[in-house]
Amino acid sequence: MSEPQDTTTAPSTTAAPMPTSTSQDSPSAQQPAQVSSATAASAAATAAAASAAVANPPMNGTTTRPSEELSCLWQGCSEKCPSPEALYEHVCERHVGRKSTNNLNLTCQWGSCRTTTVKRDHITSHIRVHVPLKPHKCDFCGKAFKRPQDLKKHVKTHADDSVLVRSPEPGARNPDMMFGGGAKGYATAAHYFEPALNAVPSQGYAHGAPQYYQSHPPPQPANPSYGNVYYALNHGPEAGHASYESKKRGYDALNEFFGDLKRRQFDPNSYAAVGQRLLGLQSLSLPVLSSGPLPEYQPMPAPVAVGGGGYSPGGAPSAPAYHLPPMSNVRTKNDLINIDQFLQQMQDTIYENDDNVAAAGVAQPGAHYVHGGMSYRTTHSPPTQLPPSHATATSSASMMPNPATHSPSTGTPALTPPSSAQSYTSGRSPVSLPSATRVSPPHHEGGSMYPRLPSATMADSMAAGYPTASSTAPPSTLGGIFDHDDRRRYTGGTLQRARPETRQLSEEMDLTQDSKDEGERTPKAKEHSSPSSPERISASLIDPALSGTAAEAEATLRTAQAATEVAERADVQWVEKVRLIEYLRNYIASRLERGEFENNESGGGNSSSNGSSHEQTPEASPDTHMEGVESEVPSKAEEPAVKPEAGDVVMYPTLRAVDEDGDSKMP
């Protein structure tokens, strides 16, 4: 009956300080009377409610009844504290103690608990289990916990993964953005891309967040606070800087490559030197490695809006444009022409490489190289019908006449088709000819972009040491009389002789024998040959005459597979070199077509009246002189203009012919 006594004494204590407020005393007196009547009817229910209120305090850790005290249940202690904080401090200081005061107790004696720890921090954390103190509050649902580890376990119950990557700092981010919230303004969420998106007006979505960010949530969700999302700005300013640095490295490497060409730093007729020099350009971002030849002054493209939002009324922010300086090694038209000639020599060297020509007879890798939008043939077989003239994929006309174009009926092929039954040694191989006798592939503009193999006359083939059997081969049609429709695949590093089809027939005919003894011996030979039959199917490119036992056949098969892989890698490298050379030639040709070069000759006519027209010639410019390519400066052959007569000005120099004796005479 202590509860009714407490409630009845409450009015007397509250009415004492306010004797004059009689109008407010009657309601305060009626309320305790109603509570006392209710508790008198159900005393047990009231006690249960009071105990529940003590066991489950509110989230801030305070109780609903300030006058209620919390008892310490430590063994032998009857202390009462007014708040959970005071109770926790009492247990830690009085019962746990400290090592410095020589009263440290690492065993919990709260009620029947006898938990023992090894450190004071551990037992003080354990005391929170018994004390109704919940200082750790969940930022998402507001639920409070006693220990930090309990809060961590609770956070994991939130299903959304974006909760786990949320920054715990207060005010760092809006929690609604974690769950991909719907149509909210997000006007204040400008923390990720503030430096890059200052010019974009902050506007909210009227139709919800874009589907792009809902279906593909990134580890750090992209900022949906703007109606327009631009690719050029989502990456921040670092992406544009990295792109500029990458393009500048490729641009400088290309300029250095052109400078090495001018100074003849490597031999363009050596396949190894050409491949080693091109290797440094293949891994760089060149200004020409795109759909077509582009100028080096290439600004960044305009940003494209994604995510369903159109451009804002204020307009998209202008993308930062960068400009690269002009190449110092390709400034004049003469530089471009001579570098194109160097590239043509390198292209001829790649096409006439011994390894690639000998890989599959006449079916060299260049035979399946097609320009068609920089696409290549997927098979190694040569085309069924070859046009009368072929050309590699170049965009500029050839700089010199090429004697390789011919009629299909005027000579024999310089390289015998691989279907011939004879093999060549190193001394009699078609590719062992001197480099001077080779003919570079022609370069013509036209619809057909197949490179044509060189041809040789009967006298040339006989003088070069070709067998007489090759003189009966057809013209450069790559074996056109053998199988026009179903072409065989010519791979590198393997024999080209087909498997005889009569072996299985001979095994079937061995079933009929003349004598019994021979019939008994025959199946024994078949037993040894039967296990190798599945392997012979997979090793169809190996000559059956070279196969022996099963172990030898397996070793030969592995060797052939390794050789095929090496040949495929070499073919891929060859195609990359050809592609890079074609890009470089397209780049030079495009600059010649657009006129992107310095005209140093334009000032010669204006200064001729001063008698210095000969100083403006291309040969006098230090930038236009090409070592090893240009002939000597024709200073003796070309003389400056004659002195003008009275009243007549001659604007053009007069040339004098030079005879064999060195005496010059006027024409």
Swiss-Prot record:
GO annotation (BP), single: positive regulation of transcription by RNA polymerase II
Ranges of biased composition (kind: Low complexity): 7-45, 391-400
GO MF annotations in UniProt: DNA binding; zinc ion binding
Post-translational modification: Activated by C-terminal proteolytic cleavage by signaling protease (probably palB/RIM13) at neutral to alkaline ambient pH.
Classification via PROSITE patterns: ZINC_FINGER_C2H2_1 (PS00028), ZINC_FINGER_C2H2_2 (PS50157)
One cellular component term from this protein's GO annotations in UniProt: cytoplasm
Main location per the UniProt record: cytoplasm
Motif annotated as YPX[LI] motif 1, chain positions: 450-453
Polar residues composition-biased segments: 404-438
Annotated segments matching region Disordered: 1-45, 371-537, 597-667
Keyword tags: Activator, Cytoplasm, DNA-binding, Metal-binding, Nucleus, Repeat, Repressor, Transcription, Transcription regulation, Zinc, Zinc-finger
Residue positions of motif YPX[LI] motif 2: 652-655
Keyword GTP-binding carried by entry: no
Compositionally biased spans, kind Basic and acidic residues: 513-529, 622-646, 657-667
Zn-finger segments (C2H2-type): 70-95, 106-130, 136-158
Known role: Transcription factor that mediates regulation of both acid- and alkaline-expressed genes in response to ambient pH. At alkaline ambient pH, activates transcription of alkaline-expressed genes (including PACC itself) and represses transcription of acid-expressed genes.
Protein name listed in UniProt: pH-response transcription factor pacC/RIM101
